[in-house]
Amino acid sequence: MPFAFRISLFIWPLALACSLSASAADHARIGDYGFDATGMDLSVRPGDDYNAYANGVWAKRTRIPGDHAYWGVWSVLDEQAQGHVRDILTNASKAQAPAGTNVRKLGDFYATFMDEAAIEGRGATPLKEQLASIARIDSYAQLATAMGGAIRIGDSMPVTTFVYPDFKRPDLYTVYLDQGGLGLPDRDYYLSDSAPMAAARAAYLAYAAKLLQLSGVAPSEGDSVARAKRVFDLEHRLAEIQWSQVRQRDLPARYVPWTRADYPAKAPGFAWDAYFKAAGLGDQPILIASVDSAISATAAIVPTVPLPVWKDYLAIRAVDGHAPFLSKAFVDAHFAFHATALAGTPDLEARWKRGSRFAEKAMGEAIGEIYVRQYFGPESKAAATQLVRNLLAAAGQRIDGLDWMSTATKIKAREKLDAFQVKIGYPDKWRDYSKLAVVPGDAYENALAADRFEYERNLAKVGRPVDRTEWGMTPMEINAYYDATKNEIVFPAAVLQPPFFDPHADLAVNYGGIGAIIGHEISHGFDDQGRLFDAHGALADWWTAADAEKYKQRTTALIAQYSAYEVLPGLKLNGELTLGENIGDNAGIVIAHDAYHTALGGRAPPVIDGQSGEQRFFLGFAQNWRTVWRDPILRQIVTTDPHSPDAIRVRTVRNFDSWYAAYDVKPGDALYLAPSERIRIW
């Protein structure tokens, strides 16, 4: 997604649930869907390490499967969801549905990818036409044309584009220009002098050389290594001028409208007309420069790099972008770099899993339409809708009770909250795939066609009214998000089913788990980025100056608190990068706790497995985030991801008074904070 203001939960699990009844029949439900008493380490004091207390035994006995970079509750549910998708695709491939139907396209796409022998037999042949086109480039204008064409098939370029609602006119779609084109995950991988980053750079150099040789672009190993080094040096120059992850969170700075004439004037050195024409943007009068200084600096770099280096760069990006659809040599090279070197994953996923994911990326809503009929019942949707309403009501009461916010800002905040659009389960209108051509027997072309289709689908939106029925996730995704330009919260079907959500579950675990997630997404409308957008989704300042300053004081303290956390030896969390998500975690748990007590209606909750209602609420929250990681992916997440790692997210509880009361946490406990040091924003 282009901006952090469509703020997702990422991929982390929601809650396991447990039964409110203590009957013998319900004890099985507690075991299946409740907090995991067997995974707790009762030798650890909750106040010293709440994550270890809630999840310690589970973490010690859990082994990460070879084809995963991490493993947690989400991983288990993802496996289940992928199994459902596999069944849908397998049935589609056997259905012999009429040509042109979604079922036929899904079946052909999946069956073609699964025909490994046919793909192996073609070797590097599918690349031939694209690489020949790159080889013919003999001017910088043709280079710009090639870059504009490359983004249409999903290749990452130094200047890329995307379509999104206009910040100032969120009822209309517009075009944004952004930075990109790096082979490593982030600029810091090029610029950091740490040993792990140096190792990642060495792995990338070897991978780039391998792609040049496998594709036939470089005639020998020695030649490929030298040419890959020149491409790496080019990317290093790009990394130096690109915006950092933290700087990219400054959304007002990312809204800089430039006219077509502004681009050659403010970013000389690049053939903008050729680029825009090739990208299908020749008639667009205004395009938002979302990283203006980086765009100008990139344009200045272009003519200083020899064309042969640029051509090798384009070839590497082309091969890397679609290597999973080529023969085994390409697949293995791609996996060894992206999954093993960068994420620590030792084993390649089964082919059916890869095929399911690629089909979901290409035709996600076509799969989703079948998925919700089979796996998402009306009872779950109705119960989830009511739960969201309860959390919205609790959020409103929380705003009303803030002692640091003025009445004027509270009124505007309530207006925004009342205007929230809530989407549950699946879209009301399914995506039209009639223009997507799927060719039986050509996996590589199908991948390109899917990317072209998605690009053209978005390009057709430019200048048109925003479709507020559109979803940014498929129903099968175990995730959720808030979109500031639409002022909406979205919860796909897969997160609203057991064991994530059970309409009959214990209130404590349901609210501590999925309730905190819903509260988290609601709060994104008022985090350090979301608060910059009004009830209509427009970038507008609706805060009093005094309230904005009080808010900044609190968020500055939160940055300092999280920046002190060490994730790996010598690797601290970036509290500025993770600020919005940390606000969401801290707000989500207090909103959910308020809603939980409202839902109790004055009733005393039962004690289950020795845990009070308050304790089960916090266990629902903590066990939600239990995950074990391989170090390389954890390092990548700390460098690039606005979410704190899961063990850090569990520490949210130390800012919440009720957690101290639930476990009698006292001075001297490792997580103890004096009341004056507990950060309270919402």
Where in the sequence are the language-model features?
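Sec/Tat signal peptide C-region and signal peptidase I cleavage site
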Residues: 20-24
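Short, Gly/Pro- and small/polar-rich lid/capping loops
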Residues: 26-38
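Noncatalytic, helix-rich "gating/capping" subdomain that lines the substrate-entry/channel surface
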Residues: 92-386, 390
